[in-house]
Amino acid sequence: ELGLSEAQQTLLINNLRDRVIVRTDGGLRNGKDIVIAAALGAEEFNFGTIAMIAMGCVYVRKCHLNNCPVGVATTDPKFRAKFKGTPEMVINFFDGVAREAREIMAKLGVRTLDEMIGHPEYLKQREVPEHPKANLLDLGPVLKDVIPDLAKHQGVGESYLSRICKA
């Protein structure tokens, strides 16, 4: 989260935000993660391992050895025969992620993901009674709104695209 927040803040301060598409990756598992990443400035979200788990991966970390015991990550016919995954399993997972993100945004009064992008004011640090030391963390720099009342997300500007791409 810190890197994402710092990238967003730096791009805004230097008036470069409309020239970059910010993508986040690693550790995204649910709709809440999407909403948090969007509020911190992410516009695109990559899912890796969790999508494989939705297909049936049991996470034995043997992908590179070509002997995945459930056939998710292998070309060996012996192991491929064990694969029971379907496209619907992954579709159902992502439908759930999208539904959860929409529910959270609705509670915040946000209608679209674009309205959420780059607005850390929707986030607040919560108290964690079961982990007292976590309450000592100062998330102020991560949740800082460096340029209040500014449109934080406008997508990559057309003028910039026209300068770097020939028609």
Region locations from a protein language model:
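Active-site or pore-adjacent capping/gating segments
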Residues: 45, 53-120, 124
